[in-house]
C-alpha cells in the first residue's frame, strides 16, 4: 500500500545552511589572500563581525520568541558578516564593523521580516552607509605588507583596530605615507587621484601597479574568481548574473579604451581591481535580492555592470560595486515582472 500525501513528492537535500556554507567555503581562498597581503587585521575584522552577527541573530530570535537555531543555523547572518568584514579596510576602527553589522542585520535584514524578505543586499546597505558616513575610515586601506618598511605585527593589528595606532604610535595613514609614490591604498584609488598628474603610463609605473604589489589585488580577485567558478559548478549560483555583469563592464570599458585611449586603466586592470570579482560572484548573486528569472538575471547583471562602469569612469568613487548592486536591487521587481517565462500554449 502506498501512503497518500500531498506534494511535493520529491525533496531536495539542499538546505539554506548548505548553500550559505558553500559560499563561505568558496570565499576562504580570497580571505587567505587578503590576510597574506594585508596582514592580521583581516582576521580581527572577521572575528568581530561573526561574533556580533551571532549575538544579534540570537537576540532577534528571543525577541520574536523563535528557536535560536531558527535564525542562527541558516548561516545567513554569518555570511552577511563575512562579506561585510572582507569589504572594509582590515585596520578600520572596530566601531566601523560594529555599526556595519548592526545596520546590515537589524536595519537591512530583520526590519523587513528576516531572511527572504529584504529588498536590498544587507551587506551592501551597510557598506554604502559606512562609506558615505565615514569616508576617511573606509578608505584607510594599507598597501600590501611587502611594501611597508615595518609591516604591522599581530599586536600592532589589534592596537590599530581598537586604538587607531600601532604600539609605536603610527596610524594607518602614517604607515601608508611611508611608502613612496603611493597617494591612496588601492589601485583604483591611486589611479583616480593620480591619473591627471601622471597619466596612464606614469600610474602604471608606480609601485602600486608594479612588482609584487600589483599582484596583491590581482591575486585576491583571482581567488574570488576561482571561488565563484566553484559555486557555479556546484549549482549554488547561476552563471547569468556574473557573466552579464563582467561582460557588460568589459564591453563598455573596451569601447572607452578604443575611443578614448590612454585616459583610463585598461580593461584587464579594471576587471581585476577593487571588488569586481567579489561583487560579480558573491554579492550580486544574492538569491533574495537578485532577479529570479533566466532573462531577468542577464538584465540584472548587465545593469550592475553598466552602473559600475558609469560610477568608476565618471563618478567620484573609484569602486562602485556596492552602489551598483543597490541601484540594480531597486529594478528587480520591474525586471521580474516583464521577464516571466511564457506558459506553454499561452500567447505572448
Curated annotation (Swiss-Prot):
The keyword Translocase applies. One of its GO terms (cellular component) is plasma membrane. It is a multi-pass membrane protein. It comes from the Bacteria. It is found in: Cell inner membrane. Belongs to the NqrB/RnfD family. InterPro entries: NqrB/RnfD, RnfD_bac. This is Ion-translocating oxidoreductase complex subunit D. The complex is composed of six subunits: RnfA, RnfB, RnfC, RnfD, RnfE and RnfG. Its main location: membrane. Its cofactor is FMN. The chain crosses the membrane at residues 15-35, 36-56, 67-87, 88-108, 125-145, 212-232, 241-261, 265-285, 298-318, 320-340. GO terms for biological process: electron transport chain; transmembrane transport. The gene is rnfD. It holds the Pfam family NQR2_RnfD_RnfE. Part of a membrane-bound complex that couples electron transfer with translocation of ions across the membrane. Keywords: Cell inner membrane, Cell membrane, Electron transport, Flavoprotein, FMN, Membrane, Phosphoprotein, Translocase, Transmembrane, Transmembrane helix, Transport. The modification FMN phosphoryl threonine is found at residue 186.
Amino acid at each position: 500500500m502506498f501512503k497518500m500525501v500531498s506534494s511535493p513528492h520529491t525533496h531536495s537535500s539542499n538546505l539554506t545552511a548548505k548553500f550559505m556554507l558553500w559560499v563561505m567555503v568558496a570565499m576562504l581562498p580570497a580571505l587567505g589572500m587578503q590576510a597574506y597581503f594585508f596582514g592580521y587585521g583581516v582576521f580581527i575584522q572577521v572575528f568581530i563581525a561573526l561574533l556580533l552577527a551571532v549575538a544579534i541573530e540570537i537576540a532577534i530570535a528571543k525577541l520574536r520568541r523563535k528557536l535560536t537555531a531558527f535564525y542562527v543555523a541558516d548561516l545567513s547572518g554569518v555570511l552577511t558578516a563575512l562579506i561585510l568584514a572582507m569589504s572594509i579596510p582590515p585596520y578600520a576602527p572596530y566601531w566601523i564593523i560594529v555599526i556595519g553589522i548592526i545596520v546590515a542585520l537589524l536595519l537591512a535584514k530583520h526590519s523587513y521580516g528576516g531572511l527572504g524578505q529584504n529588498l536590498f543586499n544587507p551587506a551592501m546597505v551597510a557598506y554604502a552607509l559606512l562609506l558615505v558616513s565615514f569616508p576617511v575610515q573606509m578608505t584607510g586601506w594599507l598597501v600590501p605588507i611587502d611594501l611597508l618598511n615595518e609591516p604591522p605585527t599581530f599586536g600592532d593589528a589589534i592596537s590599530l583596530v581598537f586604538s587607531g595606532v600601532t604600539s609605536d604610535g603610527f596610524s594607518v595613514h602614517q604607515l601608508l605615507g611611508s611608502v613612496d609614490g603611493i597617494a591612496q591604498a588601492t589601485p583604483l584609488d591611486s589611479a583616480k587621484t593620480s591619473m591627471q598628474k601622471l597619466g596612464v603610463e606614469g600610474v602604471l609605473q608606480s609601485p602600486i601597479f608594479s612588482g609584487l604589489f600589483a599582484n596583491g589585488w590581482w591575486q585576491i580577485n583571482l581567488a574570488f574568481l576561482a571561488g565563484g567558478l566553484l559555486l557555479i559548478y556546484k549549482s549554488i549560483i547561476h552563471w547569468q548574473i556574473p557573466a552579464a555583469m563582467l561582460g557588460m563592464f568589459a564591453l563598455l570599458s573596451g569601447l572607452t579604451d578604443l575611443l578614448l585611449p590612454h585616459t583610463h586603466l585598461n580593461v584587464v586592470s579594471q576587471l581585476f581591481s577593487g571588488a569586481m570579482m567579489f561583487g560579480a560572484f558573491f554579492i550580486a548573486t544574492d538569491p533574495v535580492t537578485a532577479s529570479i528569472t533566466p532573462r531577468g538575471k542577464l538584465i540584472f547583471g548587465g545593469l550592475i555592470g553598466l552602473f559600475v562602469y558609469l560610477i568608476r569612469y565618471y563618478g567620484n568613487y573609484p569602486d562602485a560595486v556596492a552602489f551598483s548592486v543597490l541601484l540594480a536591487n531597486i529594478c528587480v521587481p520591474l525586471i521580474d515582472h516583464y521577464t516571466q517565462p511564457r506558459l506553454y500554449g499561452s500567447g505572448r
